[in-house]
Amino acid sequence: NKKIVIEWGFFALVEFLVSESKNIQNKYKNALDIGSSHGNHTKIMRHFGLKVDQIDKYEKHAEINNDFNSYNFKKKYDVIFCSHVIEHQRNIGFFLDKIFDTLTDFGVLVISGPKHPAERFVEGHIQSTIMPIFLQNLIFAGFDCKNAKILSMAGIENSFIVKKSKTFNL
């Protein structure tokens, strides 16, 4: 199926893939799509030449049909893409620490979450991804946010493209 569906996190993913397109073949060989759902983002990453594994505990067609937080990965990934999964996490610190540990030393995280006020209740969203909270959680997990790309779509989502910090220290 050649059809590409634009979903949450699409613009951050395309920003990363287009800006890094010359490096994908030699710098970024594999990727993990957390909460991959129907695989639309996976198709886009594969189109750019990445070898992508999908993990989704609700989607039986994912290569890894399991919960990201409890799955024991046998390898590390150069790129991790995570779109609109973080707001559903009971422990955002554990989730981001697991992502950090699953990335290679020079790995990149492309992550997006909904942009709505923290006081607005959205069923199933138990974490806020408003910009200052999202940013602080990424910093505390060890990501280099000084050199991050930040995309904020009015009223829709906040996204970060970040690398692991080489000098992280709290």
PLM feature segments, named:
Residues 1-75, 79-81, 94-96, 127-133, ...:
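Conserved N-terminal segment of class I S-adenosyl-L-methionine
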Residues 25, 103-105:
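A generic alpha-to-beta junction signature in SAM-dependent methyltransferases
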Residues 106-114:
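Conserved beta-strand signature within the Rossmann-like core of class I S-adenosyl-L-methionine
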Residues 114-119, 152:
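Short "lid" loop at the C-terminus of a central beta-strand within the Rossmann-like core
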